[in-house]
Amino acid sequence: MKNPTLLQYFHWYYPDGGKLWSELAERADGLNDIGINMVWLPPACKGASGGYSVGYDTYDLFDLGEFDQKGTIATKYGDKRQLLTAIDALKKNNIAVLLDVVVNHKMGADEKERIRVQRVNQDDRTQIDDNIIECEGWTRYTFPARAGQYSNFIWDYHCFSGIDHIENPDEDGIFKIVNDYTGDGWNDQVDDEMGNFDYLMGENIDFRNHAVTEEIKYWARWVMEQTHCDGFRLDAVKHIPAWFYKEWIEHVQAVAPKPLFIVAEYWSHEVDKLQTYIDQVDGKTMLFDAPLQMKFHEASRQGAEYDMRHIFTGTLVEADPFHAVTLVANHDTQPLQALEAPVEPWFKPLAYALILLRENGVPSVFYPDLYGASYEDSGENGETCRVDMPVINQLDRLILARQRFAHGIQTLFFDHPNCIAFSRSGTEENPGCVVVLSNGDDGEKTLLLGDNYANKTWRDFLGNRDEYVVTNDQGEATFFCNAGSVSVWVIEDV
């Protein structure tokens, strides 16, 4: 795939009503036209909150909007037929499809069970109370409406290591379930935040139970057969033992008809943790570059005070570009969400230019930046807040520029705290470009591009600058950009 470019086709507040799959099918042609060649779909499985579920409260992995469960047949995004129609439309446009895999936990159990649990210190999960509590917990999943179709696996308390609510006595908190697999506490090879970050929410799936890991492998084979997907986005992997995903990825790659594109969400701003995880899974997955996303957030807030020479310092794309998926925003970092770190709209064209036009990493584009979004939710103070996320002007042009001009050797000119630039040399088949951006005043860079670019006339592909630039006999010229803006200079006749 030439210059892979991923679009996250949803956000946390996408409207209810089952319209997303149909909307995506209608837009598939246009996505191909601007240069999107991979789409990350929201979780397609039935969630505990039914038609209102964003998809991360997984109830039934085998219900893609087919069974009347949790008050609805369709998911928030549509029914199974509409999902498959959307996937077919994408594939007809040579756009690869990534499914979102949410197997850290389950929610919305069908039945209670008598269980035994131990209280856990929420701030240090390694501190587990010796006292064992006899209680009831919602831990049994029978999926009565599906009635064994596709899978007859019944989930019970042996499949889980933790829970956040018990009854008789009624109590909320974090509780370690006592069963045949939890004698040593939580799983290893997880993030060390809170002492051990195995537990996140709901009924925490325990991968030490062999029947559980085999069921999740079976589900992967099933969902690939049902959807013919081209890869996966793996949710919340910092809470899942790395050894499981190493094993799972080996399995799905072995049974898939062609190599799968796999990217995992390990949300940490410590690049060392990301590199450790990549090592633990033998490099079998890419990771989202959370440190870079935070850099963009900080740069957008600080304006001209931010030193752009260091925008990539301490990021995954700098440390390990072959395993980095770069991004400006996602459904967790958007305003009012759990990992809120929004990038101010003025800076987004600069950020997208830095991930779309450089050779390092695979860039991910966020739905609201391409289409806009408006929504309301409660803020930290409990009051309702309205958020308007505008369409980022010229984002479609930047995506198109990636396919047309982001080719050849890359040279960086990160020699000024506010105005930086980079060039792509082009190849025999494809032209290159010069990218100049500034987080301060109007900027300019005098660049020597070499004899191949002697006496060429250049224009700003984005149209932010009206003048033309002409290189001299040595291929040297001064290229410009506006204050707080970016320009992509290309040869006039390409």
Swiss-Prot record:
Please name the gene that encodes this protein. Answer: amyA
> What positions are marked as the site Transition state stabilizer?
D332
Note on cofactor: Binds 1 Ca(2+) ion per subunit.
Name of the protein in question? Cytoplasmic alpha-amylase
Reported cofactor(s):
Ca(2+)
Its keywords, alphabetically, are:
Calcium, Carbohydrate metabolism, Cytoplasm, Glycosidase, Hydrolase, Metal-binding, Sodium
Q: Which reaction does it catalyse?
A: Endohydrolysis of (1->4)-alpha-D-glucosidic linkages in polysaccharides containing three or more (1->4)-alpha-linked D-glucose units
Q: Which InterPro entries match?
A: A-amylase_thermo, Glyco_hydro_13_cat_dom, Glyco_hydro_b, Glycoside_hydrolase_SF
Q: Which Gene3D superfamilies match?
A: 2.40.30.140, Glycosidases, Golgi alpha-mannosidase II
